[in-house]
Swiss-Prot record:
Keywords: Early protein. Plays a role in virus cell tropism, and may be required for efficient virus replication in macrophages. Induction: Expressed in the early phase of the viral replicative cycle. Belongs to the asfivirus MGF 100 family. This is Protein MGF 100-3L.
Amino acid sequence: MGNHLDGSYQPNMVMSIEDKQNKYNEAKERSKVCNKVYINQSGKIDKKELKRIKKLDFFYSQKNDDEIERMFFNMPNGTFLLTDDVTHENIYIAQKDLENGSLNIAKLEFKGEALYINGKNYFFLENYLKTFEDIYKYPLTNFNENK
């Protein structure tokens, strides 16, 4: 079924289709996303955001909505970056909680040389990442500005 980000999807697991669906639904219900970036607090998919997220390098754009959603919930906990282009326009950082799997997503704002996340100037992304004990950095998207 193509490439998998963390190897957690194992198609040959001894688990019924119903069990797999139940496990997936439970994970979906447990997940809450701040600022309604990916999933509304109600747990319903924000289709407009999903269309945008399908373009992110973090995901495989050829996947359908359900596959993208499943990949998202199978990601290990930690911190990672999402981006949908190589500019400063749409770069997000996501932190998946280590205990309950909930997700916080914040947009990175660049103002001149300053990097603002949630209104606080961190100067460098590394300074922000250092505020978290367990950091998962895949896939950190590298980009170069062509000026």
